[in-house]
């Protein structure tokens, strides 16, 4: 079993020194991935292609799937190699292989040749094509748009009959560009933007800002692991988790409602910049698209970038949501993205679309930056290969109820702005207001003889916070499944 791997065209037009370096890196990447599945796979670099050989025919489908997902490969040919003596012998070998395939079809023959021979490529095409036409009565020659193109590569005394042509994903081999840090949330945008930088030749590390609970974190880790395993498993990468509950709580308490979105993003790029500096990473990657949400205006994006000490890359800046979702389906992250939560109470209800620097700086003046520093210092660093083991751990389940019992208290965990606008009213049960960002520090001070039913508008943050509390030993928590109307 043999494959001829063709490099991405942009690689081939580079200078000889750069082309050789890129081809060498791609060869190493292919070897790293394929030999995990088949130790006997041979990967050999040639001037304008890479040769992949394997004796294990049963691994064919797996090898094809792996090659199709390695950045830097434009396409690859599955070929059958045979020695020949003369042009007529090539025809006989070709006839034996394609006779059944050409029955009732139109066809043409295309030959590429290297080495010294008594015939040219065009002469070989005419001779072989004419012979096939004579010996297969139901087949007809058609040089333009045929049903079947018979492709033959001739090199010295060997011929390679191309059985199948497989498309690759193109791009540059991972390692030809510098490392980047992707801010991954588990949604459609961040997954696709991560993939786009991988395809462009960067090793992508992942940074996740956790707003509470294991369920969301596990979902995001699964997405990052999926992207890494499918498209960049040739390289080791890191997954960094930063607990941002305290930061969000500080913003909700001290920052003007309209400025919260921009301030939160500025805090995220500040934290990510510190992580990037630690690992000598030059750029951070976000999934923002111009105008997609209110915070993603040019004015706001410029102010967000001012808080970063690293280059901020936005590969999706001109993409429509439809395009992004279509790409997520192609790379296999759409199902995970659909299950990711939208947090209630995190982003302001009336965000500014044209933030003013002076106003942002004034609001940040109220912020205790020691909380941000503490979040970064306590970040968790994980080799992404460990995620597969970690996600197999049992996730604690939380009961959701719609009818309240006698010993139960409603715990409204929405932000103060939301509770003021739409208070939870219960004529039969006590209601305690405790914003979600205070639960970790204040829940333990409540009467633990009571059962607490957590409530938020969409039911997402309440579930995540209930999971967090259960993980920390509190068994007296449930989630209220009934929305306020």
From Swiss-Prot:
Coiled coil: none annotated. The keyword Secreted does not apply. Residues 404-483 form the Rhodanese domain. The active site is at 456 (cysteine persulfide intermediate). It catalyses: [ThiI sulfur-carrier protein]-S-sulfanyl-L-cysteine + a uridine in tRNA + 2 reduced [2Fe-2S]-[ferredoxin] + ATP + H(+) = [ThiI sulfur-carrier protein]-L-cysteine + a 4-thiouridine in tRNA + 2 oxidized [2Fe-2S]-[ferredoxin] + AMP + diphosphate; [ThiS sulfur-carrier protein]-C-terminal Gly-Gly-AMP + S-sulfanyl-L-cysteinyl-[cysteine desulfurase] + AH2 = [ThiS sulfur-carrier protein]-C-terminal-Gly-aminoethanethioate + L-cysteinyl-[cysteine desulfurase] + A + AMP + 2 H(+). Residues 61-165 form the THUMP domain. SMART domains: THUMP. It is an enzyme of class 2 (transferase). One of its GO terms (biological process) is thiazole biosynthetic process. Keywords: ATP-binding, Cytoplasm, Disulfide bond, Nucleotide-binding, Redox-active center, RNA-binding, Thiamine biosynthesis, Transferase, tRNA-binding. InterPro entries: Rhodanese-like_dom (IPR001763), Rhodanese-like_dom_sf (IPR036873), Rossmann-like_a/b/a_fold (IPR014729), ThiI_AANH (IPR020536), ThiI_fer (IPR054173), ThiI_N (IPR049961), THII_Thiazole_biosynth_dom (IPR026340), THUMP_dom (IPR004114). One of its GO terms (molecular function) is tRNA binding. Its EC number is 2.8.1.4. One of its GO terms (cellular component) is cytosol. Its main location: cytoplasm. ATP binds at residues 183-184, 265, 287, 296. Belongs to the ThiI family. Catalyzes the ATP-dependent transfer of a sulfur to tRNA to produce 4-thiouridine in position 8 of tRNAs, which functions as a near-UV photosensor. Also catalyzes the transfer of sulfur to the sulfur carrier protein ThiS, forming ThiS-thiocarboxylate. This is a step in the synthesis of thiazole, in the thiamine biosynthesis pathway. The sulfur is donated as persulfide by IscS. This is tRNA sulfurtransferase.
């Amino acid at each position: 079993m043999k494959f001829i791997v063709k490099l991405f065209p942009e690689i081939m037009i580079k200078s000889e020194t750069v082309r050789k370096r890129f081809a060498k890196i791609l060869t190493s990447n292919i070897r790293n991935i394929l030999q995990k599945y088949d130790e006997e796979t041979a990967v050999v670099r040639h001037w304008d292609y890479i040769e992949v050989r394997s004796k294990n025919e049963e691994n064919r489908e797996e090898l094809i799937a792996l090659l199709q997902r390695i950045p830097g490969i434009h396409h690859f040919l599955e070929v059958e190699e045979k020695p020949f003596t003369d042009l007529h012998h090539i025809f006989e070998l070709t006839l034996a292989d394609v006779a059944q395939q050409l029955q009732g079809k139109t066809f043409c023959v295309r030959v590429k040749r290297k080495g010294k021979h008594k015939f040219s490529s065009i002469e070989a095409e005419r001779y072989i094509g004419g012979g096939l036409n004579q010996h297969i009565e139901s087949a007809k020659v058609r040089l333009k748009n045929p049903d079947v193109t018979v492709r033959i590569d001739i090199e010295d005394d060997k011929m390679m009959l191309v059985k199948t042509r497989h498309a690759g994903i193109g791009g540059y081999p991972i390692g030809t560009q510098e490392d980047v840090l992707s801010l991954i949330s588990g949604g459609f945008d961040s997954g696709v933007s991560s993939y786009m930088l991988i395809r462009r030749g960067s090793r992508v590390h992942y940074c996740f800002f956790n707003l509470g609970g294991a369920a969301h974190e596990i979902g995001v880790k699964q997405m990052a692991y999926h992207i890494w395993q499918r498209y960049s498993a040739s390289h080791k990468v890191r997954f960094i988790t930063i607990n941002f509950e305290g930061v969000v709580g500080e913003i909700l308490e001290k920052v003007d409602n309209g400025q919260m979105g921009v301030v939160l993003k500025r805090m995220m790029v500040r934290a990510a910049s510190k992580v990037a500096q630690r690992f000598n990473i030059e750029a951070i990657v976000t999934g923002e698209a111009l105008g997609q949400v209110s915070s993603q205006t040019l004015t706001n994006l410029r102010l967000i970038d001012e808080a970063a000490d690293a280059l901020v890359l936005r590969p999706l800046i001109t993409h429509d949501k439809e395009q992004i979702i279509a790409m997520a389906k192609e790379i296999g992250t759409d199902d995970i993205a659909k299950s990711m939560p939208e947090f209630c109470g995190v982003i302001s209800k009336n965000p500014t679309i044209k933030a003013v620097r002076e106003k942002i700086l004034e609001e940040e003046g109220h912020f205790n930056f020691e909380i941000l520093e503490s979040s970064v210092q306590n970040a968790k660093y994980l080799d992404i290969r460990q995620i597969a083991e970690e996600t197999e751990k049992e996730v604690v389940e939380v009961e959701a109820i719609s009818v309240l019992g006698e010993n139960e208290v409603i715990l409204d965990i929405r932000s103060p702005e939301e509770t003021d606008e739409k208070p939870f009213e219960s004529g039969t049960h006590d209601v305690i207001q405790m914003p979600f960002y205070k639960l970790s520090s204040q829940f333990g001070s409540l009467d633990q003889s009571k059962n607490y039913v957590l409530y938020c508008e969409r039911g997402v943050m309440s579930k995540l916070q209930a999971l967090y509390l259960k993980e920390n030993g509190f068994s007296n928590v449930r989630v209220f499944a009934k929305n306020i109307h």
